[in-house]
Regions:
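Conserved Rossmann-fold cofactor-binding substructure of NAD(P)-dependent oxidoreductases
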Residues: 14-26
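ADP-ribose/adenylate-binding Rossmann-like module
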Residues: 48-63
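Conserved small/polar residues in nucleotide/adenosyl-binding loops
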Residues: 182-188
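Rossmann-fold cofactor-recognition segment
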Residues: 3-14
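N-terminal Rossmann-like NAD(P) cofactor-binding module of classical short-chain dehydrogenase/reductase
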Residues: 27-32, 56
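Beta-loop-alpha module in the N-terminal Rossmann-like domain of NAD(P)-dependent dehydrogenases
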Residues: 18-20, 32-48
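Rossmann-like dinucleotide-binding core of oxidoreductases
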Residues: 77-181
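Rossmann-fold NAD(P)-binding glycine/threonine-rich loop
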Residues: 60-79
Length: 191
């Protein structure tokens, strides 16, 4: 790695709680970029919460995020630990894009847009080993807890009490006249 000399790097065994706790106690924020988080993340998050350390990840595993929010949200607030999930591909263009658009719309029209649509026209790539492992872990979690499907099919499961805008009822391709393009909706986002 080409880190500046004043930035330390620690290698931690995610199965070794003592190693995790030692690392967490030496930092203000833990950034973890390798899942499956449902297999490796909870120990790190609970350690961060215990020490009031912030936590950021690339998680795209709604079942895991729901579990952590449900079980640890209040304790994290009390300890001053901020838990930030999903700082990866899905969030960067859309979450930050919507924020930027809404700020510009508000500045120009003195109100927010009632909805914002985002499209990815072309994308190259394939599933990483981590994504494939996360999918496999999610299938195993569904096998042991069939009720998890209710979290996975609800795009608002991570925002208790919030139902948001109406979602598409199906995942069939749709033609969008605004951009003259046929698209598929990502199942965990708005259309």
């Amino acid at each position: 790695f080409n880190l500046p000399s004043d930035i330390g790097m620690m290698i931690v065994d995610s199965y070794d709680q003592e190693s995790i706790d030692s690392m967490v106690s030496q930092t203000k924020c833990v950034l973890t970029t390798v899942g499956p988080y449902q297999l490796y993340g909870e120990k790190i998050i609970t350690s961060c919460i215990s020490s009031g350390t912030d936590y950021v990840d690339l998680c795209g595993e709604p079942g895991f995020m729901h579990k952590i929010i449900s079980e640890y949200s209040e304790e994290a607030k009390q300890k001053g630990s901020r838990i930030v999930f999903s700082c990866g591909f899905d969030s960067i263009p859309f979450d930050l894009g919507v924020l930027f658009v809404q700020e510009e719309v508000k500045a120009k029209f003195n109100k927010y847009a009632p909805s914002v649509r985002g499209r990815v026209r072309d994308m190259n790539g394939e599933f990483s080993g981590g994504t494939a492992a996360s999918m496999k872990a999610t299938m195993a979690a569904l096998h042991s807890n069939p009720d998890l499907i209710n979290v996975l099919i609800n795009p608002h499961a991570l925002c208790e009490g919030f139902q948001g805008v109406r979602q598409d009822e199906d995942s069939k391709p749709k033609y969008d006249e605004a951009v003259s393009y046929t698209h598929l909706t990502l199942p965990t986002t708005n259309s």
